[in-house]
């Protein structure tokens, strides 16, 4: 195993002119997993540092300077950029500069790339990003003002078009109507067109969730007016939790705490007022689906013919509701248990073939399988098949792109099983140890995991359930499986320590240990 160490502490102690960064309060944000990188954000050094697990098996470390005092970071869904909100500061002493809050877009693919700074006016601590990585919305969490927040507007949002450089219209700052509640989250829709609208383009809509209200903003045109819709009529105290979309009909289906039923939100054409330059061209309609019970979980899938369906579990009625997303017609299937977990296989956007249902709230030693092959046939009989698994199921995690699911049978993650969805069979997972952290490789061929305090990386080949392990030099904190097949184990060292394993077939001699990389170049940091 190769050890790359950066011995900087002695040099720092002897430095005559200490850089201001040495005396700053230091908070590390991350790691943030990306396509083939793992990134950290350093609040003292004002930079993003990333390990690049390159395809040639030789990792490298790169850094990018950003603004002062990072608050929050999030990856883009394509795994190519990391977005960071920085608070900025007021220059009051040596080493400080006047700087407003900014959102930084850092392209980690290119070590020479220059981060793009978008002025966002407020130190937001949450970021929502569209599935195509083109639009970001920065907002405040429900945590309330921090120690430095004198005034804070919880209903303020910043809409950023990540495909354009910053200008007078990018970002667009917006304050939405609150109706007495602050946003609990933001969900960005896939691109979808409003049926019948004069503007036929496919747009992204931001669904701003709050207690008893949902506000919808055209995120592709954030300067246009938002529309809010009250949820009080759907229950006594409705808190939206989850949305799934049917973009063909500009429809969202919502699961909410406190709602009596599955809620349907449909965007319809509403021609704008020609005298109002900020008028929008849509209006939402809210409907209770009539499924007869509040859903505990929902899932969306597409058939081989391109039809979209929504599955909703209603434990109070012990039913699974199957909704045609384009017509809102539905049918019900009785369930032996009050289901609160739905997993659709094979996943990864492929046409679904099977749904597996489980009761996790009050764990039972069984799961249920529903074939989705005849789901579009209204005359087809839909029956559940019960699969006895021997131990209560406390968690159910699908393997990416495979008809497999890992079952956890105890709170310590020591008793595990692998469910083969196609053959309805269960195999106990042995020789792995306690899974404190784990990940599936993107191809779904390996389960990798670590145990706190044990310097080993466990690997389970899912085609034959053969376990192997790799000895590490240091105890692990978290393991990450990147899109290019590389594995990175973070050891939780504040100065930076990680083990990079090029592939699951790599031996110990092929692994690289990077130590001290978060301090690289500290003495070269310029002093203002």
What does each of the following model-derived ranges do?
Residues 1-13:
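Sec-dependent bacterial lipoprotein signal peptides
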Residues 14-528:
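Predominantly soluble domains enriched in secretory-pathway, periplasmic, or organellar proteins
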